[in-house]
């Protein structure tokens, strides 16, 4: 996470450490190794630059500019206007926005073992009103930690990920065959956005349940396609309720709220069907030949989570994997299509790794650094989440401002990725930048 925690030096009116780069014109006394000790106390919270404290007026201007779906551009404009930190009220949500990697390191180093995250209001409202079970996405404190530890071992650990490789390879091969078939038939249009959604869902269900749903066949299960459409609708209808209380949308039974509820209902209904169906299939199968049986089977075997908690987490992972995976792939293909020289380099690397690995996909994945760098570069230019959010556990000084505990701080991913002081030629798709061994670039490893 970059720099070690320095927040212990930044409490109250104590002296603070900063880099040799002077910030906001505050004087400093030089010490050894380029570090300075600030000679002033941190400035108060209300002095953080802001476009205005009237959250509803700010929200009105945002809507007037049709900026709800372009809020990442607003972040960039505000950073250009106010500097590397600013605060803003939008509706009933007040946040401090940061983009400096050193500030981000301080933020995450101060969060403790149970981070307090910003929970998406419409998602919380739906789950609470309809009493739906929640998983790691919406849990807090000890409940979040218990689920996260269990999922780390079965979903995030390197040994667990190795089990996914043959399952993902099978889906990938089927996806390529499907596209080749269309090319040979002369019906390939070039628009594969819907196919990428199907590929993402087929991949996730295969590693979740150890079986395919047939999303890449000519005839697709209507319920499975309905699930994908519901995920899109759930995300789309969330945006208007991020700054206005979802209870207002529910009170007036707006179409936004009704569509949001309908989307979540489909997600829960179908995810529950899949989980129950594969659960009983697994119980009836006595011998699977020692092959990996999927995340669901592994979670059931650990006894660390109740069946209800498992179902809630399976639902969230299925819903969260479709849009995020497919959009990243779509942007990655777009960037490679616009940089044909880089595309040829990536193809050459993959072919060489394939020959060297002699069919061992796990070994092959260890020999494609440029491919991995290209995915990092795609996420720099097109991050899945516009911001990452944390509520401060304790007071914290950022950019020489004292920010009180419980304040919502948002890391502007898009703004940081496009900032020329952090990335040379930030608009350029340049994967080799991630292969640089520059020791000063520790924040982005």
Curated annotation (Swiss-Prot):
Q: What is its main location?
A: mitochondrion
What are its cofactors? heme
Q: What does the record list as GO biological process?
A: C21-steroid hormone biosynthetic process; cellular response to peptide hormone stimulus; cholesterol metabolic process; cortisol metabolic process; glucocorticoid biosynthetic process
What does the record say about its membrane topology?
A: Peripheral membrane protein
Q: What class of enzyme is it?
A: oxidoreductase
Q: Where is the transit peptide?
A: 1-36
Q: Which GO terms describe its cellular component?
A: mitochondrial inner membrane
Q: Where in the cell is it found?
A: Mitochondrion inner membrane
The alphabetical list of record keywords is: Cholesterol metabolism, Heme, Iron, Lipid metabolism, Membrane, Metal-binding, Mitochondrion, Mitochondrion inner membrane, Monooxygenase, Oxidoreductase, Steroid metabolism, Steroidogenesis, Sterol metabolism, Transit peptide
Give the matching Gene3D superfamilies: Cytochrome P450
**Protein EC:** 1.14.15.6
One family name in Pfam for this protein:
p450
Statement: the UniProt record of this protein carries the keyword Heme = yes
Task: State a single Gene Ontology molecular function.
Answer: cholesterol monooxygenase (side-chain-cleaving) activity
In terms of InterPro entries, this protein maps to: CYP11_CYP27_families (IPR050479), Cyt_P450 (IPR001128), Cyt_P450_mitochondrial (IPR002399), Cyt_P450_sf (IPR036396)
Q: Which reaction does it catalyse?
A: 6 reduced [adrenodoxin] + cholesterol + 3 O2 + 6 H(+) = 4-methylpentanal + pregnenolone + 6 oxidized [adrenodoxin] + 4 H2O; 2 reduced [adrenodoxin] + cholesterol + O2 + 2 H(+) = (22R)-hydroxycholesterol + 2 oxidized [adrenodoxin] + H2O; (22R)-hydroxycholesterol + 2 reduced [adrenodoxin] + O2 + 2 H(+) = (20R,22R)-20,22-dihydroxycholesterol + 2 oxidized [adrenodoxin] + H2O; (20R,22R)-20,22-dihydroxycholesterol + 2 reduced [adrenodoxin] + O2 + 2 H(+) = 4-methylpentanal + pregnenolone + 2 oxidized [adrenodoxin] + 2 H2O
Q: In which pathway does it act?
A: Lipid metabolism; C21-steroid hormone metabolism; Steroid metabolism; cholesterol metabolism
| Disulfide feature | none
Function summary: A cytochrome P450 monooxygenase that catalyzes the side-chain hydroxylation and cleavage of cholesterol to pregnenolone, the precursor of most steroid hormones. Catalyzes three sequential oxidation reactions of cholesterol, namely the hydroxylation at C22 followed with the hydroxylation at C20 to yield 20R,22R-hydroxycholesterol that is further cleaved between C20 and C22 to yield the C21-steroid pregnenolone and 4-methylpentanal. Mechanistically, uses molecular oxygen inserting one oxygen atom into a substrate and reducing the second into a water molecule.
| Family to which this protein belongs | Belongs to the cytochrome P450 family.
Summary of subunit composition and partner proteins: Interacts with FDX1/adrenodoxin.
Q: What's the name of the protein?
A: Cholesterol side-chain cleavage enzyme, mitochondrial
Origin species, per record, is Oryctolagus cuniculus
Q: What gene is this protein a product of?
A: CYP11A1
